[in-house]
Amino acid sequence: MTEPAAFIEYRAVEKAFGGQPVLRDMSLAIQRGEVMFIIGTSGVGKSVTIKLLIGLIRIDGGEIWFDGRRVDQLAERALVPLRKRIGMVFQASTLFDSMTLAENVALPLRKHRHLAGPAALDEARRRLAQVYMAEHAERYPAELSDGMRKRAAIARTLALDPEVVLFDEPTTGLDPVSARRIDRLIRELASGLGVTAIVVSHDPPSIFGIADRVALLYQGGVRAVATPADLRASADPVVQQFITGQSSGPMETPGF
């Protein structure tokens, strides 16, 4: 059976900072509607990989394709419609403390959909309901837990109905209960709304709980791409060291 054409594809991507290579000949294909986790040690280029897709960082070589179109060469103005189709939830929730959650979520609706105040707020409340935060719409970020702020940030990202959502370590710093709630939301986005989710994570319960496939970055490239079950069963010593957390082995972490 022929595998469908990739929705998102990195082709032999190269990226360096200050002359230090981070990604070298990195290739990865992601299918529409799947939950793809990108894992690896600190400094291996996981967050760089997702930022390259929307042009927050530019590649040095190779190609990046999205929905049948090459996007790595797009000018800044041409990236605007791309970024409406691809949302990103940053590690920090980046909410405005002076605004209620509803006002925060309404911002992209006013800017990009030109909704008037009441209409934007009504839609914002609907988006907050999608992440189980409807009753907190009139509260301020400082009044909420980290997990609740993270869910509000996801609601804001969903406001423009993106086809893809990039998550940069969405459960970092959260307690286990809040982390699993975020996992459930990510899974619901894919299964209920058909969103393609690309998740950078170090969190084993997330990785093995909700991923369709997992890509392990190592030495600038993709060492393995597999389902969680196949990753656990891998005989590759690099894969086994990462998933078991052993300090000794072929993997090295910069600074240790």
Predicted feature residues:
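Helix-to-loop junction immediately C-terminal to a conserved catalytic motif
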Residues: 54
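Conserved ABC ATPase "signature" region
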Residues: 69-70, 117-136
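Conserved ABC ATPase signature
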Residues: 140-144, 148
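A short, proline-enriched helix->beta-strand linker immediately N-terminal to the Walker B motif
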Residues: 159-163
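Catalytic Walker B motif of ABC-type/P-loop ATPase nucleotide-binding domains
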Residues: 165-168
